[in-house]
Design a protein with these regions (language model features):
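Conserved active-site tyrosine of GNAT-family acetyltransferases
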Residues: 142-143
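Acidic/polar helix N-cap motif
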Residues: 6-9, 135
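Conserved beta-strand-loop-alpha-helix junction that forms the acyl-donor binding cleft
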Residues: 129-139
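Acetyl-CoA-dependent GNAT
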Residues: 4-7, 15-28, 32-103, 109-114, ...
Length: 143
C-alpha cells in the first residue's frame, strides 16, 4: 500500500533507510561509510522532517507498506541545490529506496508516480535526482 508518511513512521523509516542503503551501496561506497549508518540517527532525522510543519511543507514523504511493514519510501520537494534551480530544476526527488526483497513488484513505479504527481501539483515540470554513476540498477530504473 502506498501512502503519505507520518511521524509515527519515523522508526521504521530509519530502519528501512539503513537496510536499503546497505543493500544498495555495498561495493559502491566505502564499507566504513556504510558501517557508520545508524537506524537510530536516521529515525531521528525522519522524525524531525515529519514532525516539523515547515519541513513537511517543503518535503513530501511516501511509504510503501507490505503486510503492515514499511518496505520502501521516497521523498521529494523543492530543489535544494541552487545550481540546479538556476538550470530550471525547481524540484527534486531526494530519496527513493526499496528493500531488495521488494524490488520488481511495481513499488518503485508507484513511489515515482506519487512523487511525480506531488511535484506537478506544486506547479513544477522539471525535476532532478542524483544517482551514482556506478549504480547500474538504479540508472536502469530511472531510464
Amino acid at each position: 500500500m502506498l501512502r503519505r508518511a507520518t511521524i509515527e513512521d519515523a522508526a521504521q523509516l530509519g530502519s528501512v533507510h539503513v537496510a536499503a542503503w546497505n543493500e544498495t551501496y555495498a561495493g559502491l561506497l566505502p564499507e566504513a561509510m556504510l558501517a557508520g549508518q545508524s537506524a537510530e540517527a536516521r529515525s531521528a532525522m525522519w522524525a524531525r522532517i515529519l514532525g516539523d510543519p515547515s519541513a513537511a511543507a517543503g518535503t513530501a514523504v511516501y511509504v510503501i507498506e507490505d503486510q503492515a511493514s514499511i518496505v520502501g519510501f521516497g521523498s521529494c520537494g523543492h530543489q535544494r541545490d541552487p545550481r540546479l534551480r538556476e538550470l530550471g530544476f525547481a524540484a527534486e526527488i531526494s530519496a527513493i529506496y526499496l528493500l531488495r526483497s521488494q524490488q520488481g513488484k511495481g513499488f518503485g513505479r508507484a513511489l515515482m508516480g506519487a512523487m511525480t504527481a506531488e511535484i506537478r501539483s506544486r506547479g513544477h515540470d522539471a525535476v532532478a535526482l542524483w544517482v551514482l554513476k556506478e549504480n547500474a540498477a538504479a540508472r536502469d530504473f530511472y531510464q
